Amino acid sequence: DLAALDAKTSVLPEVQTNYKPGVKNGALTYLDGQAALDSILVPEGYKIEQWATEKEFPFLANPVQMSFDNKGRLWVATMPIYPNYRPGDARPDDKLLILEDTNNDGKADKQTVFADKLHLPMGFELAPEGVYVSQGTNLVLLKDLDGDDRADEQEIIFSGFDDHDTHH
């Protein structure tokens, strides 16, 4: 008898959520860069410094993966409205960014959008032939054909992955 068995299970605790009903796709709230730094306990003899923030680079919102290339530039996959995308919603405009410090002052001062109109770019890998991006239902290869640090071509390498629940 399932009802008798269920009666023996304990009540699960309520899960706290950041979901705000009535707000389309939730709200993006971040600590200011300095406030975030101030909240981190740093061991004596060490320091942390801000290199790039959403204030200088608004497209940097909700970074998911970062990787340095052999030129010392930081590549960042971003999903600004994740995890609030639902199948049937308008596709998000997720991006793959390149941030760099062109004047060697220890802070990012240049942003290039390598690719936009991505859909849930959960990870990427830099390769000689381009950038492999796992996004949504596909693994794609993005290629920069003219050397301007912007993807010119997208090739689907694998497809058919299920993304009905975007929380992997």
Predicted regions located by residue number:
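Beta-propeller domains with acidic blade repeats across secreted/periplasmic ectodomains
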Residues: D1-H168
